[in-house]
Amino acid sequence: MKTRAANKIQTKLVTLLYGATFSGKTTLGLQLADFKRNDGKPFRVAVVDAEGGGVDDAVDELEDRGIDTRNIHIFYTQSLQELTTILDKIKNHDTFYEFDEDGNETDEPIVDADGEEFFPDAILIDGTTIFRLTSEQGLLELSKKRNTIKADKDGLVGAERFVKIQGADLEFKDYKKLNYSGQNLVLDLMAIGINVVLTAREKDETVQKMDKNGQQVSVSTGRKVHDSFKGLDYNVKTILHMYQDSETGQICAEVVKDRTRVHKAGDILEDPTLLDWQTVIDKNVDKKEFVLKNDLDKAVETE
């Protein structure tokens, strides 16, 4: 357990941007590089690219408008375990080292535009949808192994064995584990002590209803929600639904929620800018940093 006084504590951004392809999520997230620290220097930004190089084009736009991209470092991974390793490095203030062409860590520290060891003020995780998909696929492979054991035990051969193994699906306990992994990720992000922006794809929101035959069916509500780890929206402070206006083609953002009170829920931002939230950073002057440790695993052990 940990306690603190309710005054003079720094506020960090924890923002989720979700939407369809070409809705401007990555471009908006990379505006973290435009932010200024309380000492006037530009943010150092760590970018985790799980979308297969989608960040690269947006970084070129930053260079075109004069941003020193030496203050940005990009990590390419689709592994939740590797992402957790990066977050642990930030949380522990470990040194970041360059990687060689084979993906092996070297002994050369990563440096920023000032020639100092790189340590991020913010992190952009571009593609939480991918991390959920790879985690889900990993659990599906585990389910296949379970079914292989069952097939061996039942003495199945030929087509029956094939169907038993390849027809494996996630079980209830797998979904519980997947949801736990998502919650653990968000709590890890809130515990690293820097500003966080996440992106996710969108999907149709559905509800379960009875059809005329008395069967449960999924029916779309017409709303778009994030396609990522379940419960992700509860822990973040700000959520923007990104979309492209069908008539004008302009990039817009609907404010789903904003605990920082920079904008109100329901506001529609045309040509949105993340710099609206620079005021949150500016108010941190003379305030103490308070990092709430992620004790989810420890809490489970305690219970």
Where are these regions (language model features)?
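Substrate-engagement module of ASCE P-loop NTPases
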Residues: 147-203, 225-238
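A short beta-strand-to-loop transition that corresponds to the Sensor-1 phosphate-sensing loop
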Residues: 51, 126-127, 198-203
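C-terminal regions of RecA-like/P-loop NTPase motor modules
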Residues: 1-2, 9-13, 22, 248-303
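Conserved P-loop
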Residues: 2, 6-118, 122, 130, ...
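Glycine-rich, phosphate-binding/catalytic loops in enzymes
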Residues: 64-65, 139-143, 214-216
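Phosphate-binding/switch region of NTP-binding enzymes
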Residues: 187-275
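Switch/connector loops and helix/strand junctions flanking conserved nucleotide-binding motifs
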Residues: 55-58, 130-135, 140, 205-212, ...
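Short, solvent-exposed beta-strand-terminating loops
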Residues: 123-151
